[in-house]
């Protein structure tokens, strides 16, 4: 086991790593990438077949398959190192990628001709060995290489396969009869892949590519104050903390009896980063919005957060009430941290009211509309909000509500989609077993309605002697009715008007004729 070196000293160790181009790579060891006791690491078992998140402790064992394996040998090694499970000692033995590739090549001579698979029969009669024979070799403690080589030699169809099919067959047998473990450093990408592979429902179906849009569209940056509501075991809170790196404030609201931020511990954050996270019950916002007394609420429970004395207490003794074991696919633990004084209800209210928040992130399995309205008063104007859901209908409800009430601009709903590809010589193709879609995102910017000033209009009315004058204060409907009445009256009295006009003309003619007679006389 190597001793820990100072931060400014690098210990270089060259490891031959044979890939498709037969190039050698150099692994540089520094104190930042060396596995130490107390670190959280991810065990990648058989190239993604299974993931397990553990805390490294001297003398502790991890369940891999049906065996309890001692993990002392990984302390002092660099991250992304590979280990092989020893069948005899139940320990992890260091193995390089070159040794893995050489073992694959030395098992059997691969077929280099232009063979194809047209004559293969899918009747399971090509293998001469029975399952009893293979189990007998296992019980005798036969090496995995010997077992695989024996299986290949007793296969009648192996020599007729193409070289690609032979490599695929050998990799499948190596994965079945031997166990290779790679130690991965916990990051947002690696933790998301591990929990997505384990049970995607616990993290609401989030993939690592979803966080690129969540953090960017939510305007997550350093020196900002963010309000997050999630039901993903702390994965979203941890991603925001990783982006902000201890600069800013994260208000993590939870729904229910207590917070669930167990994944935050697995990131391996230092105390400065963890002290920026403030968990609180979402009921606080509802009480504030109603104007009720906040002192009536029970004290806010805190978990997933380190206080200043947590690391010292962990080194001395781990209290039973602060540790909750979770047995899922092996031995894994969730650490619940002591309650902090600065996560009291009064302090949370002060953080919400003093300056508000500039980003609102909602990732939950519940309906997002009520949660959004509860948190909306504390999002500053021009602040960014982003909501994730596995289904588009809840986001449509939020979009329509905000648009109708003119509460947000630049709203858009987008679908998260990604397709992973295998890139190998003459074997490049999309991965057939992955999910294409990973939910939907609604994002936008909060706006405040402008104050509408009341305007007074003055109407001047002129009085005329016309009998059919229209009152300007009447409604449009009454004007239409009166116009129709006037038109009807005009059309019905057209004949009487013409007769009256003729009578007046006759009178004028008779009067003019009388005047002429008087003049002549």
Curated annotation (Swiss-Prot):
It is found in: Nucleus. It comes from the Eukaryota. Signal peptide: none annotated. Residues 1-24, 305-336, 452-521 are annotated as: Disordered. Pfam families: Gcd10p. Residues 308-334, 510-521 have a biased composition (Basic and acidic residues). Keywords: Nucleus, tRNA processing. Its main location: nucleus. Residues 12-24, 452-476, 487-502 have a biased composition (Low complexity). One of its GO terms (cellular component) is nucleus. InterPro entries: TRM6. GO terms for biological process: tRNA methylation. Belongs to the TRM6/GCD10 family. Substrate-binding subunit of tRNA (adenine-N(1)-)-methyltransferase, which catalyzes the formation of N(1)-methyladenine at position 58 (m1A58) in initiator methionyl-tRNA. Heterotetramer; composed of two copies of trmt6 and two copies of trmt61a. This is tRNA (adenine(58)-N(1))-methyltransferase non-catalytic subunit trm6.
